[in-house]
């Protein structure tokens, strides 16, 4: 999992979901797990 300043480019990928967990924003992509990231 990468830690990224901005998730805008990742959330536009096909299969991406934006999820909030414990006050942090995550992008999960089951279709292409390379694009899994946390904002920070």
UniProtKB/Swiss-Prot annotation:
Q: State a single Gene Ontology molecular function.
A: structural constituent of ribosome
Which cellular components does GO assign to this protein?
ribonucleoprotein complex; ribosome
Offer one Pfam family short name for this entry: Ribosomal_L36
Write out the entry's keywords from A to Z: Ribonucleoprotein, Ribosomal protein
SUPFAM superfamilies referenced in this protein's UniProt entry, alphabetically = Ribosomal protein L36
Read off the InterPro entries from this record. Ribosomal_bL36, Ribosomal_bL36_sp, Ribosomal_L36_bact
Q: Name one GO biological process term.
A: translation
Ribosomal protein among keywords: yes
PANTHER family annotated for this entry?
50S RIBOSOMAL PROTEIN L36 2, LARGE RIBOSOMAL SUBUNIT PROTEIN BL36B
Concerning its family, UniProt says: Belongs to the bacterial ribosomal protein bL36 family.
Q: What is this protein called?
A: Large ribosomal subunit protein bL36
């Amino acid at each position: 999992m990468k830690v990224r300043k901005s998730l805008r480019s990742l959330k536009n990928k096909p299969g991406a979901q934006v999820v909030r967990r414990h006050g942090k924003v995550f992008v999960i992509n089951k279709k292409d797990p390379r694009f899994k990231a946390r904002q920070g």
